[in-house]
Amino acid sequence: MTSTGSSSSAEATKPAATTAELVVGIASYNDVDTIGDVAAAVRSGLEEAFDGTASLGGASIVESRILLADGGSNDGTPQRAREALGPANATLVEVTYPRAAGDLLDVPYHGRPARARALRAILEGAHTPGVKACVVIDGGIRTVAPGWIPALAGPVLDEGFDYVSPFYARHPYEGALTKGIVYPLFRALYGVRLRQPAVGEFGGSARLVEAYLDADVWDLDSAQIGIDLWLAAGAAAGGFKLCEAPLGRRTFHTRGEALDLGTTLVQVVGTLFADLEGRVDVWQRVRGSVPVPLIGDPPAVVLETPQVNVEGLIESFRLGYRELRDIWTWTMPPKSIVDLRRLLDVPPQRFRLDDDLWARIVYDFALGYRLRVLPRDHLLRSLTPLYLGWLASMILQVRDVPPEGADARIEQLALAFEAEKPYLVSRWRWPERFRT
């Protein structure tokens, strides 16, 4: 197939239908520094795995199309993508999507303006006759490898999976927000052990693409900020067949200043809490969890140990207790406040925030979010020192154990979230029990 540079509007007409069975969508905005490598890796992945020379699971030839969903980059991103693809054995279709005024001033936590619009444009481009699988890649990733494409598409094309979530290699200290809140809460709510549900890449089936496009979430504020989490939750709660694919390291091209932790908590945790309200009939019926199969062999990676000031984390927790205790009483019962008070005078090396207490704290904040006991932004920001206290406690417990031991420790935490879930359910059903 010949590479083209055609362009169309995401809200006007879909790209012209082709015989493609696989669509790879790249979401981009001012990614000129990375888009060339991303596009080249996508091209190589398609050629190596799906052109008949290196079959994947018996699939000899899979016709493919590359779709670039660009948000109006002014740095030459689309041109650089076309140059990198060259005479690729795939069709490049550029899909522009409008960004609402203010997008550049209200950047989501993953740093991508109007990401929900970009993903919707890609899904609409993949919702054409004959397409069996769609893979989404972010144009700002520095570490995309050709193997990512068959890893994300293969389980859909060859094994009947509907949603393929990446599993990235991370040091035990990395991805702490995912390990401490997102993963255990997601697992307890939806009953699936999807370990990294907030990342920006995935593979999806035609059935899942159609379900996403039929959902009425695209114009909601929570979707604009946390669309990746919503897509993962939709797959988990919708009865679709899920798996994970090991992709190695993921590093991202950052633009501008990184968001502060409070803003990140507002956006990431706020998305999860908003999803609780929308899927209450699903998660209240879920008990326990089931593992998600890992399809493929993890690539060999070398992980560097981040430098973390544990004493500084503990001091931030203690300062937060002194300054925010009265605010916390609006969302936590007296017993939890007393348990936190006991941590103020503990020597740093013996600082431990128990798993069951941490799970109840997260559930209390979810209930406080639902009941609007405080402005939601203020409520979620007040979670920051509590999260830092949990992080300090976790680092102290895993810093001298091998990676397998750190993984086992997160498993214990996730089990605590499952065990404490009735606490959330009962207070959700009977709000008068809140803060008791």
Predicted feature residues:
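A conserved acidic beta->alpha catalytic loop
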Residues: 70-79, 141
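Short beta-strand/loop segment that forms part of the nucleotide-sugar
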Residues: 50-73
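Terminal low-complexity segments of carbohydrate-biosynthetic enzymes
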Residues: 269-436
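Active-site-proximal specificity loops/subdomain of glycosyltransferases
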Residues: 86-129
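Short beta-strand-to-loop acidic/aromatic patch adjacent to the donor-nucleotide binding site
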Residues: 131-142
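Conserved donor-nucleotide/metal-binding helix-loop-beta segment in metal-dependent transferases, i.e.
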Residues: 144-167
